[in-house]
């Protein structure tokens, strides 16, 4: 895994964060499953896609066909995703991105990105690397590795953690693919998160 500190220019980080604030709580529980496609050579539609293009250059995935991106929004007391492999979930054959990556917008209690050395159909994981959420930190790893998000205690998530939910963990997840994953729309095609383009909704809490 490769970790880059101070990955993006701060004005771009702020504009991207402001755009995300505009969508409020839209699809908050489904945010990890609301993904978009940005083809190579595309003109960004808003600040978040500008950030995707900037991260793409840092990742070095120059020959990829495009980037699949989504907003990872969750409270670390109630993580909505288990450990998993990134893959073309609607495709007929198992296919993984060339690279997976996570950009962090803020620091939170727990919420570490955890990446194992386990690959599909391989032996069980023998090694685990973690990256704590910090503003403007960017983590890049091979797209076929088992990974997940730890909870507020820094443990594998299970039941909801009791106590105050704390700050919302906010990330931009970008996967780089040799070919477009099946059925993933562009942001313009999707009809969701219109606030990213400028129309304001209720603020995130």
Roles of regions detected by a PLM:
Residues 1-70, 77-80:
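Non-heme Fe(II)/2-oxoglutarate
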Residues 63-68, 72-197:
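Catalytic core of non-heme Fe(II) oxygenases with the double-stranded beta-helix
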Residues 201-205:
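Eukaryotic intrinsically disordered, low-complexity regulatory regions
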């Amino acid at each position: 895994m490769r970790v880059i500190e101070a990955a993006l220019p701060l004005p771009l980080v702020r504009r991207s964060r402001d755009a995300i604030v505009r969508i409020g709580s839209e699809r908050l529980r489904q945010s990890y499953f609301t993904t978009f496609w940005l083809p190579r050579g595309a003109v960004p539609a808003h600040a978040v896609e500008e950030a995707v293009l900037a991260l793409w250059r840092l990742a070095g995935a120059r020959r990829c066909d495009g980037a699949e991106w989504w907003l990872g929004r969750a409270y670390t007391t109630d993580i909505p995703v288990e450990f998993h492999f990134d893959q073309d979930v609607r495709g007929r054959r198992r296919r993984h991105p060339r690279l997976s990556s996570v950009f962090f917008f803020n620091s939170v209690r727990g919420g570490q990105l955890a990446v194992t050395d386990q690959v599909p159909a391989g032996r069980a994981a023998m090694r685990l690397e973690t990256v704590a959420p910090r503003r403007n930190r960017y983590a890049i790893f091979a797209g076929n590795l088992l990974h997940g998000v730890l909870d507020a205690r820094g443990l594998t998530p299970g039941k909801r953690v009791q106590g105050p939910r704390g700050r919302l963990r906010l990330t931009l997840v970008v996967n780089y693919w040799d070919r477009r994953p099946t059925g993933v729309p562009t942001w313009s095609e999707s009809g969701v998160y219109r606030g990213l383009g400028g129309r304001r909704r209720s603020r995130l809490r």
